[in-house]
Amino acid sequence: MLAQLVQMARQHQISRRAALAGVGGTAAALTLASCSTAEEAMVAATDLSDSEKVLVWHNWAAYMDEDDDGNYPTLLRFQEQSGITVDYRIEIDDNDTWYAKVKDQLELGQDIGADVACPTTWMASRLRNLGYLQALDNNNMPNKVANLAPGYQSSSEDPDRVYSIPWQGGFAGIGYNKKAYKEATGKDAPSSMADLWAAELKGRVGLLSEMRDTVGLVLLSQGIDITSADSLNDDAFDAALAVIKEQIDSGQIYNVRGNSYLDDLATENIIAATAWSGDITVINYEQATDEDPEPFGFVFPDTGATLWADEFIVPIGATHKRNVEELINYYYDPVNAAELALWVNYITPVVGAKEIAAQEDPELAENQLIFPNEETLAKSFAFHSLTGQEEQRYSTAWQNLLLGA
């Protein structure tokens, strides 16, 4: 099961999340990155972890367990146990926009203001190839060595898992407001991408600005095998973009956004959207009432969902690598991994977490969005690994479409 999941994740070569804000800078960053090479090996910053018990963490929204007071229980416990103070910052709304903010410092080998970040697999691979990452030390992460699921233990980009270590994974499908969708369409739930183009939803549909997920879902709906270079070719990609452009131009689409699409669901600016699996759990938690404890739903389109993974990395200029390794080791304890997974509802890469979760919540431990079985994985797909030329062409075309949206 996990071997299949990771193989898909390895092929996921372009951004998971994207926001229209700053998209011009994103395109520029992408162009620069595709032309860059690591001509000289960079030297990692001196590690000050022995004397400075701090670290700064860049992560995505809705990606940490949270209590009613806005605290992060597992992270607070790590700080208490380790004595390391964590400055946890929600800085990544999209891989490319995040990269645009930090690329200048990375190119110079300087501190980007974060000791650890969790970009998507494709971005972690890019940063590694450019020489922008520090190697991690397994001696400081015995839990990672013991509990990293077998399917994750190597990747074509990082065979020995020296530079990147899985954080969480998930699916992209369709999220929707149950009550509003029923009122608008008369149906209980959407079942296909075509349902998003229904006239009853005009102006009330959101799309993720993540190319691999939104375009991927449309490609799947057109019968394209996105795991195959023969099937997912230039003509297929252009045809999918044409469908999306038609829906934008017609006014069917309210907007195209990154993580902030959740705001539009919460305020009912949109009724349905391409969405990330765990996010719908979070918005249900935030918007639940006694009368309606689960106002939002998430479904795989009948033609399949897309799949992605995000990974811990330590930038070349970070000065607290040993502290980060202690953090990673902590989250690879199955008890901590289970607690996190049961809250964020994303796929955990930690062996033993499911068994721990089953003790706490047997029903949730069978949730296919957290612990997917072979049947669920068979319905999810990721882009085949793109060449540099393909990545440049597809990403530029997507960004140009967003600029005109």
Regions found by a protein language model. Give the residues of each.
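A structural signal for short loop-to-beta-strand junctions that line the ligand-binding cleft
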Residues: 110-119, 134-176, 204
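Conserved C-terminal helix/tail region of periplasmic/extracytoplasmic solute-binding proteins
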Residues: 372-405
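Bacterial lipoprotein signal-peptidase II cleavage site
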Residues: 36-43
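Early extracytoplasmic/lumenal segment of secretory-pathway proteins
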Residues: 48-125
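Mature extracytoplasmic/periplasmic domains
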Residues: 314-379
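Ligand-binding pocket segment of bilobal, Venus flytrap-like solute-binding proteins
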Residues: 204-210, 214-222, 227-297
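Extracytoplasmic/periplasmic substrate-recognition and gating elements
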Residues: 275, 287-343, 405
